[in-house]
Amino acid sequence: MMRLQIVPILFLLSALVSGRVLDTRETERRMHPLFSAGSGAGSRLKRAMPMIVFDPLKAEEQYAEYWQGLAHQTLDQQLESKLRLNTQLAKNVMLFLGDGMSIPTLTAGRVYLGGEEKQFSFEQFPYVGLSKTYCANMQVADSACTATAYLGGVKANYGTVGVSAAVQVKDCLAQAQPAHHVASIAAWAQQQGMATGLITTTSVTHASPAGIYAHTANRNWENDAEVIADNGDPSLCPDIAAQLVNSPIGQKLNVILGGGRQNFLPKTVRDVSGAPGRRLDGRNLIEEWQRQHTNSAHYVQTRRELLGLSNHTSRVLGLFAPYHMPYHLDADAEEHPTLEEMVQVAMDILERQSAGRGYFLFVEGGRIDHGHHDTLALRAIDETAEFDKSVR
């Protein structure tokens, strides 16, 4: 009842501050401005996206029949695809996640691509839907509990990854109980003999990719220093980076590509960029991974090394940044591969290693979300466009 009383009071205050009664007509004009077509034959005015040049209006767009034809074409395509019943068993599974890619982001992204009429590749899929998201204990979800949901099919508590709702955030003892662990799609795929991999533009120990292989009571426990800072015991509750290298699921991953070198290195060691490691246990997890996987397994740190891998590569660990990979607009083209390039290399390796049994690949465009968090709209939208390229 209190909430219903507050709304008119706030509205009244806004009117008083303005010093005059709100003009409905003026407000309507501001919200829905009308533009003149202008005299230039090649000009085309679009809605509120400055500094972007759009293609001239197509002649056929002037006619109602053009738009009606598009509608009929779309309807025919959908009907045809639904009439052909697909009874084939899927061989390869690729899960693409655009973290932070809301409907408004898609709308702005289409304009960024060239106009409202543009479409992302995934918008042309035969089936498109929406899902509601929430954690077991919170209405507004984070990337941790949702990773457990879409990768394991289980609702979890806010801030936890790969564990059931029996584990509260930072509860080390509960994390240590195998009965609370939630298996991921990658675990199921490995049980079927399939090749598996993960790709992200964030750190490979971040919440979303961690749902593939980790079971943790705190998404921030990406290295042992973070576990200790929360009065946890790393020997009882291994950090996420340690789980990636030493857990049964992490050890079997054929492809691991993203950022996050600092979480794998001791604080006494600096990576290739000069950034110090974060670990307090003195372990170099990169070297541990290399000792586990010899012969045709490779560790790479640059785009050149990734694209130069031999056709005999069976496994690859690629860490291209101290933490998250740079935004595409800020990246060094020689040092940092694009998401599209990482996907292509991963598919080649997984196809070879699947031995005909198929593969599972998780792909995250994770920095869309970061751009929105930091109000970097252009970068969020450009990351969306880059994500779209990886899906095509």
Sequence positions of predicted segments:
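Short, polar loop/linker segments at the starts of domains and inter-domain junctions
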Residues: 272, 276, 331-340
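Short, well-ordered amphipathic alpha-helical segments that serve as non-catalytic structural scaffolds
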Residues: 342-346, 387-392
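Long hydrophobic segments that form regular secondary structure
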Residues: 335-356
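Flexible, glycine/charged-enriched surface loops at secondary-structure junctions
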Residues: 297-301, 354-360
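N-terminal catalytic scaffold of extracellular/periplasmic and nuclease hydrolases
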Residues: 17-314, 322-323, 385-388
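Active-site His/acidic residue clusters
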Residues: 207-214, 323-333, 357-358, 362-390
